[in-house]
């Protein structure tokens, strides 16, 4: 049937159905279905399913009904799928997640394919029909979280799922929240895959928890996906948008890619995110392994269903992530030592400069202190001078007052003398006395002038007798003239001595001549 059906049929419907179907073995239908059928119908299902006997999986895209068989539910599902795997756009929530209808717990479901926004425990989205418990290659765009225990292989595509099983070698774009469960399912699909990564996914994510389980790495980018650890997994290459929640205990390999992780972290886990050109190393808590991750993390929250649903028992808390942290290459000891030496030299230079400035400031301080003391002493001296000046002013005032009193006393005496001057006659003795007094005054003035002249002569002689300046040409001429004078005086003295000797010799000769003449006269007589 391929149309709009508002009645109830037992056959697979391929359109919009709002009736209630009876239990019958049907085949998968394609289209939009709003009825409740016992089989995996394709389309929108809003009905309540009856308990069918045995059905086959539907392969349609949108399914909003509640299916009770172990077949897959394809499409939009607004009911609760107890135990079935859908391959459509799933907005329903499986057993442990959000529930829009009240149903009992169901066994493990298969993978949901296509575009899933539900939060199943672990459902691998398959574009086609899948009836077995083993997960097949998912092909689609899934925002749901799937729970399955089937082993999964390398997946490729864009994944927004949240699973608990680990798929080895999944490559694509993962935005789901990945949990942990036993035995990964082999997934191999197209660009949008419900890859449920069980360990540290690509991007710069390296979660670590206290539970020692085997951890793997994934190369790619994880956004919005919570990744949990699985017992055995391998490297997955996806563009994952999930937040890792693995509990890695064994040594893990380096991851490379682009990741945006949720800050919900395990108690002892730490996630380091770096750019694609930087390599960092994070160590796990209570483990002995480290993982070098290279990628870019934007730290977004994982997709957690809102509603009265129970969280999967196998899921662990997500690990915290450090956002946008960029670390460069590690510094070597030689570089560190060179930096320390450089800083030491700079510190010594600054210390010497500081000591020089401190010495100069100390000298200035001493100078200021000395000048302050000098100013203080000068101020004291000025105060003393002010006191002396005040005392001198007082004495001068006293002298002025005394002089004024003396003038007051002399003025009447002078007046009386003037009055009596006309009547007094001077005697001869008084006149002589007056002349003698005037003569004494003249002699005293002359003596004073002579004393002043003598002082001038003495000063002139002292200046002349002092050491003469040899550079003065006048002094040199004076020396030459003095030498000539000395020579002339010596010649004069020598000539005077010779004159005396000549006179003596002439007297002796004269005396002998006279004696000879006397002797001759006596002889002739």
From Swiss-Prot:
Q: Region Disordered: start and end of each range?
A: 260-293
Q: Which InterPro entries match?
A: NSP1/NUP62, Nucleoporin_NSP1_C
A cellular component term from Gene Ontology for this protein is: mitotic spindle
**Any coiled-coil regions, as ranges:** 331-461
- Which sequence positions carry the modification called Phosphoserine? 411, 421
- The residue spans of each sequence repeat are 6-7, 46-47, 78-79, 115-116, 143-144
Query: Which residues are noted as glycosylation sites?
Result: 471
Modification after translation: The inner channel of the NPC has a different redox environment from the cytoplasm and allows the formation of interchain disulfide bonds between some nucleoporins, the significant increase of these linkages upon oxidative stress reduces the permeability of the NPC.
Asked whether the UniProt record includes Nuclease among its keywords, one would answer no
Q: Which GO terms describe its molecular function?
A: Hsp70 protein binding; Hsp90 protein binding; kinesin binding; nuclear thyroid hormone receptor binding; phospholipid binding; protein-containing complex binding; PTB domain binding; SH2 domain binding
Any idea what job this protein has?
Essential component of the nuclear pore complex. The N-terminal is probably involved in nucleocytoplasmic transport. The C-terminal is involved in protein-protein interaction probably via coiled-coil formation, promotes its association with centrosomes and may function in anchorage of p62 to the pore complex. Plays a role in mitotic cell cycle progression by regulating centrosome segregation, centriole maturation and spindle orientation. It might be involved in protein recruitment to the centrosome after nuclear breakdown.
Protein name, as recorded: Nuclear pore glycoprotein p62
